[in-house]
Amino acid sequence: MQRSLKWFASTTTVAMLFVLIGGALVTKTDSGMGCGRSWPLCHGQWIPDDITPQLVIELSHRLVSGLAAIMVLILCIRSWRVMGHVRETKPLAVLSFVFLVLQSLIGAAAVVWGQSDFVMALHFGISLISFAAVLLLTLLIFEVDKKFSATSLQLDGQMRFHIYGIIIYSYLVVYTGALVRHTNASLACPSWPLCAKSRLLPVQFHEWVQMGHRLAAAVIIIWIAVATVHAARYYREQPVIYYGWIISLLLVLAQMVTGALVVFTELNLYISLAHAFFISCLFGVLSYLLLLALRTRRRPATAAGRSVEDTASAPLK
């Protein structure tokens, strides 16, 4: 694969990560209206007269998003030409660009006309899909699947259930987390893991939003732990699956820790951004596992004379 394409794909992936973190920074610092009700300009000007921290954050996010959109478009065109023969290339290229444009339009609509918190909570999730698609394109360009013998994978039904179920459910968790930010419910519950030491259940809307997210997060932590145990028992000889789940477990635990620290530090900005970073990485890993699962589904369910069910019926040595 062309060295220049690999470098460009890596840079584009990092740029998309900056888009995600930048969006979280805008929300955390309440900088969404830093440029007023004007888009793409700031207060209708190319160079605003009154420079404020919120304006700098919002304008920087717009510039990074615009640059990332151009880079993603170039990456899509180049990858389409160079490796269009790979089945996943074209769908991933379309997903990465379309969802990046969509998140930009939602952001612009929020600035110009305003949007409800429930609609704005979709903004981060849509960006996350674009980031995951760019990341998968990059992994295909680096031929990671060949390096880890991913082309010979065989997955049993239980592992498929974990992969499909967890990535769908993780998107719900992401939405609840974004809703916490956009409804200003991050500090609605002063205690952790319960909302308050003196009572078990929330009593008002913001507390319900916060505790709903914590409950959803607890479920995904347990689910990923179960999937990791299954991978450790049956997939040690398939390192891309085994280590994929190990990394997922470490990331979701880091997500839990930073989520708790957000409460204990009363919304420390760096910890809040780390919280967004870890969920972005986790979704990227889960997306790659999904790609592998979809690939294996297209192949006959036999390997070396044994069925998938036979392979999964006994632990790998």
From Swiss-Prot:
It is a multi-pass membrane protein. The keyword Cell division does not apply. One of its GO terms (cellular component) is plasma membrane. Keywords: Cell membrane, Disulfide bond, Heme biosynthesis, Iron, Membrane, Metal-binding, Oxidoreductase, Transmembrane, Transmembrane helix. Pfam families: COX15-CtaA. The chain crosses the membrane at residues 7-27, 55-75, 92-112, 122-142, 160-180, 215-235, 244-264, 273-293. Pathway: Porphyrin-containing compound metabolism; heme A biosynthesis; heme A from heme O: step 1/1. Residues 28-54, 113-121, 181-214, 265-272 are extracellular. This is Heme A synthase. It comes from Geobacillus thermodenitrificans (strain NG80-2).
